[in-house]
Amino acid sequence: MSFRALIVFCIAIFCFLSCTSSSTRQTQKTIEKPSNEITEKTKDSGYYLTQAKQNYAVTHDLYQRNEYLLQAAEALQTEQQCEKSIRMLKVLQPELQDNRHLTHSNLVLAECFLILSDEVFDKVAVILANLTGSYGYQARIAALQAQLQINKKQWLQAAIALQDTDIEELQKTQTIWQWLNKLDLTELEKARLTETTLQPWLQLAIIVKRFALEPELFNQQLVNWQSRHLGHPLVTSLPEEIQQALLQSPIQARRIAVLLPLSGRLANQGLAIKEGILAAYLENIVAAELHTNSVIEFGESTGETTPSNTQQYREIRFFDSALKTAQQLNALVSDFDVVLGPLVKEQIIELTAILPTDKILLALNRVELKTNTPTIEQLHMDNTEESNFAVAEHYYFSLAPEDEAQQLALHIQQKQLVRPIVFAADNPTTQRMAAAFIATWQETPRAIQPDLTIFTDNKDMRIRVSEMLDVAQSEKRIKQIQMLADVEVFGVERNRRDIDAIVLFANPEQTALLNPIIEASLSPFARKSLSVFASSRSYSVDLNSNSLRDLRNLTFADMPWMLPDHNWQPLAKQTTQLWPQRQDTLLRLFAMGFDAYNLLPNLRRLRTLGQLVSHGLTGAINVDDQGVLHRRLPWAQVAQDRVKLLAMD
């Protein structure tokens, strides 16, 4: 045995024993009678280390010794002793000459890194990039690649990698389905053109996103898809949420009670929502009449009686919820199928506690939900004849500013920006948004906490920007050099280089002051300009060309209704004629009322199919399993004196 080989083996043994020296020794039992049975030794890490020692002592075969030591490292991983396995592999790897052994050792090392920590993906990526071949370990390599892609939220690439793993087929099918559902329709369509092996999943995901809100067409498309992929695990084990959706009936909102504050301090907000609901109601009536007339004309031309499947007219009634107790509101809605509202959180909490379970509620605000909120399965049971109990069906729709902040954080991360700083006005709403942004940002492993600056007024704003961008320090250094130099010094302030994005939570007036200050504070010597992002609170439809110039290069999110070139131009023209001086806040509440009414028939299916979205005036809306509605807003950017739309996330 060479001296170096002996040292390697001794160190490997030491690594193995170092973590077991403190373990409790088992009491030896006296064997009274020798057994004639021959039992197979347990092939644990100790077994493989013993084999390595004994085999090498006899044969001096380095290859076989290394094989046993690698199996010992593998066994240590199985025994949940990854620290010990890593130490052994780091000692052993310099001695490995066979490429298969190198690949095996690197795989065990990478797997142990991920078992021990969520912050080692960079190490694992380097290990996988340096593999010289798969050598029969393709399934394990694919599993590691899938984990890397999940960490980067690259769901399509994760699904591609998962196909080559050796996990159970049904579990693999279900996992791929869950991951691909995180893609939007555009991403799915693009993937369908290139990823032939994922066709069953991609096609079904596209069918759900395109047709799930049109039950007859959805059923037809689903049957066609099943016939194209007979025998595929996704067909034989159709996703549970789709099975539930097929058994559900849409909400039949025959009589709707709307609870809004139509008097008192919230009267303006309540009236704006009411007008949005009425606009949607009247639009539905016109659409129904046009459809009915077309059906009648078709029937007359063919001489056949054609049954009409058009939506029946709904009865809708508005009640003033101001200064009313939950008991009074409950009495008002006793003869109605669906309740839309109330708007005030306290009233929502009190009303949901006493509202009969046969009433469907779409509250116009979001409240803290209890843990016993009914699940999708319970709601499904309640819609079947076998159910012996009723479950309350409640939904919650709000224009929550925190949702915008969370979307903004994810958007910036998708842009591969890693060090934003945040400026927020000194008021409760913008500070809540800043807190939500930072909390979402830090959910990503190893994310650097953004610096947060709160400003109180315009003067304070200028000081805070100068301090946060280190411009004040740069000015101070220039003055010091001027004092020391005997000649005239020409200096240009430089801003800090460690940030790559600026986030603003402020109103349009504050943003119009902030943006030029930030622009003036940025050094012309910088390699690239800093991106400036904001929420919908920084934009107003009343901004003229001069005001927009102050916001140039600002990227922000807002509901489609507030942006140019949306799909509801006739409705926008009517509202402008009726309310030419309406404030932005009331315009947004009008859009909320419009969407709330139109969402009613589809709420149940949206809740069952969490990946499904409904596009409305307020954004792309989905419903989570607790009945809470969430919005995704489109992105826009101010280019000189106009607003241009950007691609959705």
Which residues make up each language-model segment?
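Segments of small-molecule ligand-sensing domains
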Residues: S536, L578-L645
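Alpha-helical protein-protein interaction scaffolds
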Residues: P34-I242
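Short beta-strand segments enriched in small/hydrophobic residues
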Residues: P250-A272, P420-V422
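Bacterial N-terminal signal peptides
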Residues: V8-F16
